[in-house]
Amino acid sequence: LLVACTDDIAVRTPLEKLLEKRRQCWLIADLSWFEDKRYYSGLNDEICIYPTVNFTDFHDTATLHFSKKFFATYGSEPSRFAFIGYDQGAYVGLSAMAFGPNFVSSLPDATYEGLINSIHIRGGGSAPYNDGIRFVVIYEDTPHLFNQ
């Protein structure tokens, strides 16, 4: 399972090499990775989840708490990648806690309301879709993602 919260080329290149050498892998990454995936053969993958970012509610108490802790720790305001990274880490971590050591097979059943991403996967149509207010996009070329 790979979780990436940046589109920085310094991170993308080593992750691309890892993706090329693996047998099976879930990738949770920024949507901009999908836009460039024609350049990254490892990202032309059958098992990928690409979150999109709609908004961050800066009036929400959890968001304010995260922003204050981030500022106290790093001395700057969190970027959207900080929010994405937090949400993706929490989604994966809470899924592991809820479903146990073999959580990857149950990952699509996890529901998460994050600071910037909401993830609530539903089956239906030709491909699973996310039913969250803010959403994860599962593209039509990955319909068998949840048949694993």
How should these model regions be labeled?
Residues L1-Q148:
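Extracytosolic ligand-binding ectodomains
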